């Protein structure tokens, strides 16, 4: 009798588990598994987005991508952007977070936190439009200031040698506040007694930072680097609004390259590949 009751109870538990996991599994299949399968299927065919006729081309789309010099440049651009964005963002985030954590002026801290976090919640398109005007070669605000100071105009977005750096600086300005909050949260977990012991030993602040603070918050720094790297590989809005991949593909990144092939050149097969 007990075995039958136990068996019935186990069945109910299994059914409950299946019923609980089923909605999440269905959503995962619909929004993740199916799109991936369809992308692989679509990459084997040629044809435009508006045409129902598709021609099977096998691996030709993959060959076109692999031998496309623009694709190679796009990969290099994406890696350069990721390294610059993650590096600058993390250095600034750590410096600002350590300064705010050590400062005793609460009102100033609150004001600084609000100022650096506000750009993060603003639409990326809005930020891109504003900076596109600020960096405009002839009538942009930044170049107007440089001209007023008797300096030459700076080609922020109009030169292949400066466009990528300008784009990185805009993205760092927008995103650094979020990473500052993450690093500050990690700094709050460091026991104050460790710093007190370091002060009693007259340990220099720089040595305290590198020997105590940095190792204690290293897991959070690693996490933020991963998050920032993922975000940098997904950049699209700023490129689309500010540069459209130019000049001369100097800011063309992976996501924008895929978008351009699918919607500008009308070749979704290559985009899926």
Predicted regions located by residue number:
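Short, Lys/Arg-rich, polar N-terminal cytosolic tail immediately upstream
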Residues: 1-11
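A structural signal for multi-pass alpha-helical bundles of membrane permease subunits
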Residues: 9-273
